[in-house]
Amino acid sequence: MPKTAKPKKPVDVAELTKAQAKVEWKRLALELEVHDRLYYQDDAPKISDAEYDELRRRFNAIETRFPELVSSESPSQKVGASPSGRFKKVRHAVPMLSLDNAFAEEDVRDFVGRIARFLKLADDRIDFSAEPKIDGLSMSLRYEGGELVTAATRGDGAEGEDVTANIRTLKDVPQKLHGRNWPDVCEVRGEVYMTKQAFLALNERQKEAGDTIFANPRNSAAGSLRQKDPAITASRPLGFFAYAWGEISGTPPAETQTGMIKWFEQCGFTTNPLTRLCHSVEELIAFHRSIEEQRAELDYDIDGVVYKVDRIDWQERLGFVSRTPRWAIAHKFPAERAMTVLKDIEIQVGRTGSLTPVGKLEPVGVGGVIVQNVTLHNEDYIKGIGNKGEVLREGRDIRIGDTVVIQRAGDVIPQVVDVVIDKRPAQARPFHLPKTCPCPLHTDVVREETATGEEGSRARCTGEFACPYQKIEHLKLFASRRAFDIDGLGEKQIAFFFEQGWVKEPADIFTLQKRNAGLKLEEIEGYGETSVRNLFNAIDARREIALERFIYALGMRHVGETTALALARGYGSWDAFHEACLKVAAGDEEAIAEMDALDQIGDTVIKSVAAYFAEDHNRGIVERLTQEVKILDAEKPKRHSPIATKTVVFTGTLEKMTRDEAKATAERLGAKVSGSVSKKTDYVVAGPGAGSKLKEAQKHGVQVLTEDEWLQLIAE
């Protein structure tokens, strides 16, 4: 038997070449974009918190080493995901940002050290507010004249969803602030959550009624709050902890974070009773250990603790870095684990033909959730080899019949992190990926190639649109919230129409009403005249669609939402994009070069676009679809700052702010701050003592500003 090649360790970020970094940056950016959408908008995460955090850490490390890769579309510059469209949008007066994470005690020490250096203080002179990190749905409540006027989810940090009617049903949210002398405008922020006991009771009722079972309290809280009918929300026992604020007119009611928490209580809000004031790093770490010990006994889910600089004036001085405040951090807990038996491995076929092994488990409770299924990713993962060739589980393979260790960190689909070899039965069966697709056609299965042309770890059915499993997944994507977003046409309805032969391709959706005289949908159980009329109205409402949504809805491999947006902005209109795609498919070198020059577009996407439009079948699908819909031109990105997208270098001594404060301000306004001067530099801000960088600026003809000129520029 030939020897298996030894898996390679992942390349350290410090050893990546610029070309390698660019490829991995694009891949990670797309992954993070998808997972942010699944978590924040769909309430349906597909990876664990630990997996997500690892993706984010590596992505941030690449951007730190190669800052030229950072763009306005980078996940590092965003928070959460855009509002879904099911509710009216609300723009936050003050953005709702996310937090950086600490995973080890050393990370906490570094966090405190950075703050002390920024403020030029000793570590022991800084007090911190410490509180449990509630695993729920972030919310902003706006009060005007003491009356609740708007409640909005976090969304993408800039815009959220208006859930005011639903929030009014929560007993923890006062309709009118208690007391008197409140600010004219006050935004109270916090977390909507569901207790573990309420979650279990709700799932029991859902099960008895034959309705959807929620995976965990966080998903149940999010799903309960984001209901169209407030009566449903009112029937769900939701709580709210207040812990922060957004816009406040005039002077804040307190000078410290802990003072604001007390003020929230006076106004009628519930705050977390475990919140503490800590005076040192040691006290922060002791608080983390104490809360972790209490975690299992708490009646609500938490996934860590949060530390915040207590003095509000220091918070304001520290400011923000990209999508996170510099003055706060989340100290996460390790993921929860359990052991169970892997009973079987089944194959699922995805939209692009990818074959994914799914492990069927002996049901086991992990963190309050009963887990029965687990993704096993691909054949290499099962063999103990990672995506980049690294060794997993010390090389131990996973076999049917094995006792496995399951890890869950607040997610829906957990992961196998280890195999208990001592418990492996003699009859345990190694897994071998089938050579043909499990679809009725049994078409051949091939391994996908990597970006370097090597055989990859993922297998794919070669049936393309002939494979019914792929066809139906394409249609589900087309009608999904992030594509055409057709209300009333969910996955179950798509599957039913497909099985009946009524919808075989996207254009069929828009001809349903014409064909309904023969189909008679209203006579089908579960429909009726009103629901059919509503469905047809919803379909008609989507006959106009944004270019980026249309491109995404085509379901081309490697063309997710971010890539679709980049293509839409690059070409501007459907006609221009369509013409370019046909030329790329025909091998036109000029068209290929033009597409390659677009931001975030590389060889993998170009090959995918070419392959898609080279197929007669696909071109026919597109042609028939464009006869039914109107595709709107792409909107140009808005630039609100005079220094947005500009590259700035600071040199010399700044007298009105620290260097860190100047850098933070520039980045907050959309500029890129560099440590060296080149021809691509737009501004050099020079203070007393400016040396070689000032000379370089003069050499390259870069505009040089004094500190006062800089402050005047950014004030415009």
Swiss-Prot record:
Organism: Bradyrhizobium sp. (strain BTAi1 / ATCC BAA-1182)
Protein's name according to its UniProt entry: DNA ligase
GO annotation, biological process: DNA repair; DNA replication
EC number: 6.5.1.2
Gene assigned in the entry: ligA
Catalytic function, reaction form: NAD(+) + (deoxyribonucleotide)n-3'-hydroxyl + 5'-phospho-(deoxyribonucleotide)m = (deoxyribonucleotide)n+m + AMP + beta-nicotinamide D-nucleotide
Family: Belongs to the NAD-dependent DNA ligase family. LigA subfamily.
Single GO MF descriptor: metal ion binding
SUPFAM superfamilies: BRCT domain, DNA ligase/mRNA capping enzyme, catalytic domain, Nucleic acid-binding proteins, RuvA domain 2-like
Keywords for the protein's UniProt record, in alphabetical order: DNA damage, DNA repair, DNA replication, Ligase, Magnesium, Manganese, Metal-binding, NAD, Zinc
Residues binding NAD(+): D49, A50, E51, Y52, D53, S98, L99, E131, R154, E191, K308, K332
Domain BRCT per the UniProt entry, residue ranges: 638-716
Family matches, as HAMAP family: DNA_ligase_A (MF_01588)
Role according to the record: DNA ligase that catalyzes the formation of phosphodiester linkages between 5'-phosphoryl and 3'-hydroxyl groups in double-stranded DNA using NAD as a coenzyme and as the energy source for the reaction. It is essential for DNA replication and repair of damaged DNA.
Pfam family, any one: HHH_2
Cofactor(s) the record lists: Mg(2+); Mn(2+)
